[in-house]
């Protein structure tokens, strides 16, 4: 089987491999399918192992992601090296995979800038306890005071189209970067085919209007938040949806961590993510095999 482009029709095939092997957003269903067009993701499956590659960001033809599926990680990488047949470059390798790989392989590892995932304790985001979260709690209290009749509604295949319409009308692409426009477009696509992805999400409503919404997925002990949108005219909406998402999934699934993805080198995003005091940064590396 040759490598083939990843499309929505492949969700059912790839989903079993993209579950709970790593906490990194890059090895999750939406992490792959939302960004497949952007990074040129391709895949093939052989002997129960999923191989994925992307257009190289470093001048070569392809970089390969960690293979997922049956057998040990090292066995899967041996199989990948046989598949590639020549010099192997891997990207988006989580830091916690390096020690195991070093047992059997010689490679150079370089941290990839601006793509480390922000990892938070789920209880911190759910309850915002302590002095360091006082500003967040104040904004939530303001939202509750201004909109006492707010409701939290689970996103389903039946109501996702209404959220998508809200995106189309209320989240303008004017003045946004190419990357932000791509994210907006693919957020709408996720909503339009919501059931296919098997993800979870919630909309924060005030008087029937969508003030904010979020979409993510639970992988093992971690909630990965892929999408979070809000209207700035609803003061405190971002803080409220962030808190409610973490609290709901903590109570429902017993998660330990929330992964709020990377900051892509954007200073505004970096400050916003740091303001929630991450427990640690999930670093990712590019590997060159000898």
Language-model-detected regions and their locations in the chain:
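Short, conserved active-site entrance elements at the starts or edges of catalytic domains
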Residues: 158-209
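Conserved active-site alpha-helix within GNAT-family acetyltransferase domains
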Residues: 97-110, 138, 264-281
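Conserved donor-binding loop and adjoining core beta-sheet/short helix segment
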Residues: 22, 27-97, 205-232
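Acyltransferase donor/substrate-recognition loop-hinge adjacent to the catalytic core
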Residues: 106-176
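Short, extreme N-terminal leader segments that mark the start of a protein/domain
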Residues: 1-19, 232, 285
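A conserved short alpha-helix in the GNAT/GCN5 acetyltransferase fold that borders
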Residues: 77-82, 143, 242-250
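A residue-level signal for conserved active-site and pocket-lining positions in enzyme catalytic cores
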Residues: 14, 143, 273
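Aromatic (often tryptophan-rich) hydrophobic motifs at membrane interfaces
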Residues: 200-289
